[in-house]
């Protein structure tokens, strides 16, 4: 497994991020990414405006971390969209991998955004499509 320092040196300009908001969800998401079932993700747009997170940049390679902070995957951003929560569709939900359908996505993301104090039916979301560039191992 590559250290985070080595991964960031290899992919200059990369941003390191933790998929998910718990250890269990992080492990599930990394497994879905590795399997190829997860090629998209989203979050509230405001976290990129307020500096909580770094907005993905098309073409940039970023480093997905496991819950312990170790480099797990290098991902390349293919597309970034701004879309309202209530305009999310089945196509984008399917790319996220962890949801059965749009209704399941809405339940999951409403709970997640509510926990973070960011939910509104029309909240702007960032939707990213990505590909795996390198798997640093489990």
Predicted regions located by residue number:
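Mixed-charge, low-complexity intrinsically disordered regions
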Residues: 1-74, 80-138
């Amino acid at each position: 497994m590559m250290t985070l320092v080595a991964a960031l040196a290899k992919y200059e300009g990369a941003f390191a991020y933790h998929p998910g908001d718990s250890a269990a969800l992080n492990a599930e998401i990394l497994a879905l990414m590795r399997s190829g079932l997860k090629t998209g993700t989203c979050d509230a747009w405001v976290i990129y405006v307020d500096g909580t997170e770094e907005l993905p940049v098309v073409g940039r390679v970023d480093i997905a971390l496991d819950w312990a902070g170790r480099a797990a995957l290098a991902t390349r951003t293919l597309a970034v969209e701004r879309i309202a929560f209530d305009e999310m569709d089945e196509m984008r939900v399917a790319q996220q991998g962890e949801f059965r359908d749009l209704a399941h996505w809405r339940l999951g993301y409403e709970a997640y955004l509510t926990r973070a104090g960011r939910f509104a039916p029309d909240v702007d979301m960032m939707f990213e499509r990505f590909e795996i560039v390198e798997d640093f191992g489990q």
